[in-house]
Amino acid sequence: MKARLGSLLVLATLVTASNAACSIQRLKRLPNEKSDECTDVDGGKHVLNTYWQKNCEWCFCEKTAITCCTKTLIPVSYDKKRCQRQFHSENCTYSVVERTNPGKTCPVNGWTI
């Protein structure tokens, strides 16, 4: 019980610190399925009470659900006529650059998840 509370505290801290949006996938266990692991939507197996990172999300395996929280901030308030956003999958971030000169960054006044 202490381990689970500790894990939930860590997840809550990550969510709060990153201002992340989360989704919860309730688990439907089959009679022959192990109860000490989770199976994600891609068929990946994860040990109970563990974290992993996939597709720019942090995920956590609980006994009844998998919780995944995005860690990507999306620029929303910038000059959309003069500038465009670029996604960098290697570090799950966006940059906003000029359309005519992609080497020059544009100011961003607001971000969202």
Curated annotation (Swiss-Prot):
Belongs to the beta-microseminoprotein family. GO terms for cellular component: extracellular region. Keywords: Disulfide bond, Secreted, Signal. Residues 1-20 form the signal peptide. This is Beta-microseminoprotein. Homodimer; Interacts with PI16. Disulfide bonds join C22-C69, C38-C61, C56-C92, C59-C68, C83-C106. InterPro entries: PSP94. Its main location: secreted. It is found in: Secreted. The keyword Transcription regulation does not apply. It comes from the Eukaryota. It comes from Rattus norvegicus (Rat).
